[in-house]
Amino acid sequence: RSSYAFVTDPLPREVLGKLGHTLVWESARPYLYLRSTQEGRLLIGGEDDDEDIAERRDARVMEKARTLAAKVEALWPDLEINPTFCWGGTFAETDDGLPYFGPHESLGPRVHFAMAYGGNGITYSMIGAQLLRALIEGREHPLGALFSLQREPSMASTRR
């Protein structure tokens, strides 16, 4: 599977409005996410598809960026969105839709993983960073079992 994203040039504070210092995850299928950066850019992504051949994925990047920009403009009609840097990437996902964070029992406690974000790396990266930091510091994290590589299959694994 592949996902697509782009970043805008820095936008003036008055143009960004309430989107400054925020993260939005619109969960329709295909989903849309955006977040602002410290310098006033918008990072926008989504438009996942089943493409796993890099050349074909890369040929779709501009079309996907235009589609994402149009979706953001439909949600916030006062914004004019122009992709500055665009990219696509292949991703992995688990049966239950949650990423894996932490050690694998067969590799010992000093090898940690952060993987299978299912195209939601922007959303899950902060949780993963906090969880891995706690593990490295020898602390338990309240979400550790939920994202463990040794977790039990859940009802969510029947989501498809």
Which residues does each PLM region occupy?
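C-terminal catalytic lobe of FAD-dependent flavoproteins
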Residues: D50-D58, A70-R160
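Hydrophobic pocket-lining "lid/loop/helix" segments that shape and contact the acyl-thioester
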Residues: L34, M62-E63
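General structural signal for secondary-structure boundaries
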Residues: D9-R13, E63, T158
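Flavin-dependent oxidoreductases
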Residues: R1-T37
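A non-catalytic, amphipathic alpha-helix used as a structural packing/dimerization or gating element
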Residues: E63, T67-K71
